[in-house]
C-alpha cells in the first residue's frame, strides 16, 4: 500500500544509550524539531490532602470529575463529546513545525478508544460542567511490560475554562485513581516551552533525560 507521506519523525533521549542513534540521525540529515521535558513521579509519596480544597471549590462552581470508563461511558453521547474535546485539546499541544494534526473519522476514534479501554487503560478523567466536557487527562498502563507505571497521553482544558486549577485537579483525580489501582509511578512530558511542566514540579515530579524529536523531509 502506498502512503502519501513526505516526512519522517522519530525520537531519542538525551542519554548515553541513545548517542549513536542520535549521531546516525544527524548524519542522515534529520533536524532537531522539538525538545520535551520528561518527568517521573512516585505517586504514592505525594501528599494529596492540600488539593482537596481545590477540588471542593471547583465542585461548588459546578465542575465535576468522572472516570470515563467506569462512570460515564454508557451515556449515549459520551464518545461524541469525548472526541470533540480531544480534538479541541490537541490543537493546543505543541508539535514540531511542519507536522499537522489529522482528525480521525469518528469510527476510527471509537476503534482506538475501545482498544485503549480494553488493552492499556490506566485511567481517563473528564471534567464536566453543565453537561459539557471541558477538560480531560488520559493515562496508559502497559500491563505486561510495566504494570506499575502509568504514562500520560494527554492533559488539557478548553481555553474558556483555564486558570481555575482544573488541570491540577484532573491530575490529582487521576493520581488518586491510579493509587487505588496499585500504580506506583507516572511518566509525563511537556514541550520545552510549555508552562504545564510547572504543575508537575509542584506535585513532586522530578526531571529525567529529555526527549528530542528529529524530523526529515523526504522526496
Language model features with spans:
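Active-site/acyl-donor-binding loops of N-acyltransferases
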Residues: 28-48, 123-125, 176, 181-219
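Conserved hydrophobic beta-strand within the GNAT/NAT acetyltransferase core sheet
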Residues: 8-12, 152, 186-190
